[in-house]
Amino acid sequence: MKIIGIESSCDETGVAVYDTALSGSAALRAHSVYSQVALHAEYGGVVPELASRDHVRKLLPLLRQTLAEAKLSVEELDGVAYTAGPGLVGALLVGAGVARALAWALEVPAIGVHHMEGHLLSPLLEDDPPEVPFVALLVSGGHTQLVAVDAIGDYRLLGETLDDAAGEAFDKVAKLMGLPYPGGPQLAALAERGIPGRFCFTRPMVDRPGLDFSFSGLKTQVLLAWRNSDQSDAIRVDVARGFEDAVVDTLAIKCERALDTVACQTLVVAGGVGANKCLRARLQAMCRQRGGRACFPRPALCTDNGAMIAFAGALRLQAGQQSDVAVRVTPRWDMAALPPLVSRSCRR
């Protein structure tokens, strides 16, 4: 099956073609992403109405571009997958509307995909994918969750953030230190030059049982340290390093605890913060020390993209699942409520 995937949940427009007749990374025939960062920069964050309108402008040209890169005509598609939630309702409706219309015109099945299931499965697009069962850390600007994956489509929430997501905390700390939007990646780049231990911040909630997270108190601690400093460039990089170390340590401690809880040695990390170099190195070292393995998607597939949607959709379409003809989206959607897969035969 040749499946086209459409992602439009927030401020990236993503389109990809996944071919189940191929294996490994070769199965991803093409993928394209258009980012709206420049559009939202002057507002310091995503403006939902502007995001929706930009998806309308960019989605069809991106579809044509991706099909051309895959060397396919639209008539050769066997199915359509699209992000149905969670996300911004207007942005989701743009992608869902285009996907449903395309599927109807081609007389092929369509499937609405859970955005976070797409992220969770994205490491399976690589040449040496992890095998189930595994523990997944989903870490992005909107989510920080630990999920036990007993089988593809069978998910148990182990813990989640009680307030700010890790990526959200990165962006907010960057903003309070005067970095332009989106500040998270710039903060991480500054942290690489900082001196370890110059600023030591709390590792929140690691001293109590459980697998939930909280980053709002850490954010306040960083704010106070920054306000009480001379706010020089040298201090900025050291504060950035102290903050990043605190977040990475917290995530690593909770991940190790989750692996122990479910008696598993494989950790999958996905979501935008999964591209962070410090986090990758820390989790890889932790898993190696345990005799286990940490698996990540390539950095280009950590942020929102159509490839993960095409792949997740292919799994469910091959299992015989599909969505009805109505254009429906679910801005808030519990991944544990997803139907299990009847078949696990989709080739990777």
Swiss-Prot record:
GO terms for cellular component: cytoplasm. Pfam families: TsaD. Substrate binds at L138, V139, S140, G141, G142, D171, G184, N276. Fe cation binds at H115, H119, D304. Its EC number is 2.3.1.234. One of its GO terms (biological process) is tRNA threonylcarbamoyladenosine modification. Keywords: Acyltransferase, Cytoplasm, Iron, Metal-binding, Transferase, tRNA processing. One of its GO terms (molecular function) is iron ion binding. It comes from the Bacteria. It is an enzyme of class 2 (transferase). Binds 1 Fe(2+) ion per subunit. It catalyses: L-threonylcarbamoyladenylate + adenosine(37) in tRNA = N(6)-L-threonylcarbamoyladenosine(37) in tRNA + AMP + H(+). It is found in: Cytoplasm. Its cofactor is Fe(2+). InterPro entries: ATPase_NBD (IPR043129), Gcp-like_dom (IPR000905), KAE1/TsaD (IPR017861), TsaD (IPR022450). Belongs to the KAE1 / TsaD family. This is tRNA N6-adenosine threonylcarbamoyltransferase. It comes from Xylella fastidiosa (strain Temecula1 / ATCC 700964).
